[in-house]
Regions:
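A ligand-binding cleft/hinge motif common to bilobed small-molecule-binding domains
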Residues: 101-112, 178-181, 206, 211-231
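Acidic, polar ligand-binding/catalytic clefts
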Residues: 87-90, 94-155
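C-terminal motif of bacterial Sec signal peptides marking the signal peptidase cleavage site
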Residues: 17-21
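Short beta-strand->loop
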Residues: 113-135, 190-191, 224-242
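Bacterial signal peptide processing site
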Residues: 23-26
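An extracytoplasmic/periplasmic, membrane-proximal ligand-sensing/linker region
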Residues: 36-46, 50-70, 250, 254-309
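Short beta-strand-to-loop elements that line the ligand-binding cleft
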Residues: 73-80, 95-98, 188-197, 235-238
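Bilobed "Venus flytrap"/periplasmic-binding protein-like clamshell domains
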Residues: 47-68, 79, 120-121, 136-202
């Protein structure tokens, strides 16, 4: 059974339902309800794909760049988990959220967010090295130790697996679907444990706390500096299907003019040398392109597939 948190026993629809009480209680400073929301100070929040303190330190330089582009103050922070950023957007506490696909879909269903941009990343080879080409998708992988005796998804039965939050696309949803495709129930047939950050999943594996880690491809790179032999000590036993890249999403009541301003600002930052270095360091993003909600229909299909009772 899953340990640490009960949300692994919840369906994604229930995860969304938990947010149902999040009303628009915040002060609508800087907006006219009849015209839509126009921020006087922009609040931007990230989800913790790695240590929250590390991620916030990497993201803080974005404040000045965005402020210069938009002409207003900008505040950047990191949420405690995937659900809290959705809650914050639903309650009008956060204007812009860097949401992974499943979290975006949940936020959209709540009426809390609209997608404006999608990240571009460099493709990743099976050995973890980067490709030169930019892609609009990524994959999740199951990583195990070389000497584990685990050679396939089927071998994960009854094994302890490090997952991310239930709304994490690469850290839970796609891996859970892969387990199901191999006749394994992600709740009953494996021992799931939740960790905060894909780096922590790999570290837990290396420390022997878990038998496998479900992470984005290839999260081993983010711990390589501290664990130089991580690639030699581990192997990938399965790759998931493609996952749409992360979103830049905004609160749903924002005016179209401000949505366009933010699109232009993030695209410009991604093209600048300083900005590119920052966004690459945060989430391995290489730049941004305008996106549409229909790009995430496949995410809805996967979310429906992995619902549990």
């Amino acid at each position: 059974m899953f340990k640490k948190i009960a949300t692994f026993g919840l369906s994604l629809s229930l995860a969304a339902g938990v947010l149902a009480g999040c009303g628009s209680s915040a002060d609508e400073t800087g907006s006219d309800a009849s015209k839509g929301y126009e921020p006087k100070e922009l609040t931007v929040q990230f989800v913790p794909s790695q240590s929250a303190a590390t991620l916030e330190a990497k993201a803080k330089p974005l404040e000045e760049l965005l402020s210069d582009e938009l002409g207003i103050p900008v505040k950047v922070s990191v949420s405690t988990n995937y659900n809290t950023i959705i809650e914050a957007m639903a309650s009008k506490q956060v204007d812009v959220g860097f949401l992974p696909p499943t979290a975006y879909v949940l936020a959209k269903e709540k009426g809390a967010a609209d997608v404006i941009l999608q990240a571009q990343r460099k493709g990743v080879n099976d050995d973890g090295s980067e490709k030169d080409e930019l892609v609009d998708f990524y994959k999740s992988i199951f990583v195990v130790k070389n000497d584990s005796g685990i050679d396939s998804v089927a071998d994960l039965k009854d094994k302890k697996i490090a997952f991310q939050d239930v709304t994490s696309s690469a850290g839970y949803v796609w891996p859970a679907a892969t387990l199901m495709d191999n006749d394994l129930d992600p709740i009953k047939d494996v021992q799931g444990t939740t960790v905060k950050g894909h780096d922590q999943a790999i570290i837990s594996l290396l420390n022997g706390d878990v038998d496998a880690a479900a992470v984005f491809q290839d999260a081993r790179n983010i711990v390589k500096a501290d664990y130089p032999t991580v690639f030699e000590d581990t192997k990938v036993v399965s790759f998931t299907e493609e996952i749409p890249n992360d979103t830049v999403s905004v609160r749903s009541d924002m005016t179209d003019d401000w949505k366009k301003k933010l699109q232009d600002a993030f695209i410009a930052i991604g093209k600048s040398d300083e900005g590119h270095e920052i966004i690459r360091d945060i989430y391995t993003h290489e730049g941004y392109v305008v996106s549409d909600d229909s790009n995430f229909d496949v995410v809805r299909e996967y979310a429906e597939k992995v619902k549990t009772e």
